[in-house]
A protein has these predicted regions:
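Core SAM-dependent methyltransferase catalytic element
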Residues: 224-240
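Conserved S-adenosyl-L-methionine
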Residues: 216-226
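Conserved class I S-adenosyl-L-methionine
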Residues: 1-43, 45-52, 57, 61
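Class I SAM-dependent methyltransferase SAM/SAH-binding core
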Residues: 55-106
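A conserved beta-strand element that flanks and buttresses the S-adenosyl-L-methionine
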Residues: 119
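A short glycine-rich, Lys/Arg-flanked "PGG" loop and its adjoining helix->strand segment in the class I
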Residues: 134-146
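SAM-dependent methyltransferase
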Residues: 151-210, 220
């Protein structure tokens, strides 16, 4: 994907979250079953980095379940981080950092840190182009302890007829279909107004190739979420 298209897709998603951040957060007041499954298996004293932490619901859930390790959340949205600060108990060993995960220096504030677990739920599918995804994964790998785990989820929206009906032609965003990659889609948003956002639909083969290219191997894969239990693809990776 050429740099201009990458920049336009990133701008599209930034504008979406700036415009519909409050409405989006209202739809994310409960964690998905797959996320809860992952969190319930975590060591309660782990050093945890949560990429794309959003409104802090994950951190609140951890505290309620007795987590007493270190939690650091990273997100680009000031509005969502402000909401997270209001939610997370002051007693929690938690810190929040505003940084754009698409930027080359998003990890600057974490220099020299090591984590037992890096989480990236619903993050990679909003990053356009393989090179941008690889860069994030390489940085995540560098932040992991030697025995650490990278755990992520990918939205499998094509498994839902309702969501498939929300797909929009690229022309609505002023982008040509020939300029995007296979698996790239434009979805609409209808809560509190009409918006558009970019999402990539990952296949298992794509994720395997990404893991291999960035020095990981896949330990576990499972599907969860939605009425049919297959709207989220979850994986646990370990550095090779």
């Amino acid at each position: 994907m050429d740099p201009d298209t990458v920049a336009r897709l990133l701008h599209l998603n930034r504008r979406f979250y700036q415009t519909f951040g409050d409405e989006f957060s209202q739809t994310r007041q409960r964690l998905q079953p797959g996320v809860r499954r992952i969190l319930e298996a975590l060591d309660p004293q782990a050093r945890l980095l949560d990429l794309g932490c959003g409104n802090g619901q994950l951190a609140v859930y951890l505290v309620e379940k007795g987590f007493y390790g270190e939690y650091i959340g990273v997100d680009s949205s000031a509005a969502l981080l402000n909401e997270a600060r209001k939610k997370i108990p002051n007693s929690a060993n938690a810190a929040l950092i505003q940084a754009d995960l698409a930027a080359p220096d998003w990890d600057q504030a974490l220099s020299g840190r090591q984590f037992d677990v890096v989480l990236a739920f619903a993050v990679l599918h909003h990053l356009p182009g393989e090179s941008l995804r690889r860069r994030l994964l390489e940085k995540a790998r560098a932040l992991l302890d030697r025995q650490g785990r990278f755990i992520h989820s990918q939205w499998q929206f094509l498994n839902s007829p309702r969501l498939r009906a929300r797909l929009q032609p690229w022309q609505k965003a002023g982008i040509q279909e020939a300029d995007v990659d296979p698996g790239d889609y434009l979805l609409d948003w209808r809560r509190g107004g009409h918006g558009l956002r970019y999402v990539h639909h990952f296949t298992g083969a794509e994720l395997q190739a990404l893991a291999t290219a960035t020095g990981f191997h896949i330990l576990e894969t499972f599907y969860s979420d939605g009425e049919t239990g297959d709207l989220g693809l979850y994986q646990v990776w370990k550095a090779t």
